[in-house]
């Protein structure tokens, strides 16, 4: 027998063999119970069920912090439409954020990655001595940093004392992005609310009292003023307020000003001045201005006083025009030293001295008149800003709020009346505290009189009298 004869029957047997593997899968009821438990103890709803409320979401893929004012369309710009009383900040990992002490509302957006313990807090007092000397205040800032992204809600008002957080103040946020090209001089001591940036520099400097020589030369060239422009004041310096805050470098800053986009219709506004463009502003409303370094503030601001119109010459209202008068040169003459000539010479010298004294008195009297007029008219705090500059104006000031709330009369407590044995006269309360009554007016046509207008409390008597007249006529 050959080999094929032995292999052939083996192949036929192997072709009829089949392998069967039985696997049993048991499904537990854990998922169904969890699903049922979630449906029973559900604590969230769909976003469509919450209307007219902006949803806050934490952002994960960020390299730099994101500032956004809530309730505005353009929350990242320094415009009036971006004013709001709450600021939302999305912070990337390992980036510190400094917020004013007592202004933190909420920390959110971290529950998906880690716990709240990842956020570290530290209290700092930057520029302690300079702020105490130049401004007479000390501001504490809370440093927040985390290894994971998180989000913050910041209020424009601070619960800490000394930050202008009274009940009469309405404050709004405005955001600034510093790219290193321009610096900002912040004149309000309570304006800096939140800031971030590793290369951001915040320093305190003294307010300049007088203008610079550069601005003095430009004023002499353009206006040809009679006054000595070397001693013109900037109008910013006062013993109550000696310094300002300078923001330089790169970073983001959240400022607050006295003004809100709701309520009384007030807000914070941005004004752009072109080259050699001028504007008059009340210095108490000036929140911030762009500068080029710490010594540039004296190159763009000068104190302004409204001139008084002279009644003797009402047509000449511009006091800055220099009218050149012809100068006559008188050659000295030799006189004989007689008694009469000496008397005349003394009289001339006395007359010249009296004229100089009168000119000095007139000069200071006119200055006192101008200062008094501007003070009484409320224009004593005006300054003139020369462009090119960017300005931030706040519609309200701390002084205006204090004045407004002082005007409102307070309810005086009523005097207590104690019973006595003396006889008292009864006062008719209806005469002093009479309640208004409603009267009904009607018109009657009487012969010989025409239309007669009358008023009554009730038409019943009038209707009866008219019916009686009709009955008498019918009879």
Curated annotation (Swiss-Prot):
GO cellular component, one term: mitochondrial inner membrane
Transmembrane annotation, as ranges: none
Keywords for the protein's UniProt record, in alphabetical order: Mitochondrion, Transit peptide
Compartments, as annotated in UniProt: Mitochondrion
Residues annotated as transit peptide in the record: 1-30
Coiled-coil segments: none
UniProt GO BP: inner mitochondrial membrane organization
Family classification: Belongs to the AIM24 family.
Protein name: Altered inheritance of mitochondria protein 24, mitochondrial
Organism, as annotated: Candida albicans (strain WO-1) (Yeast)
Gene that specifies this protein: AIM24
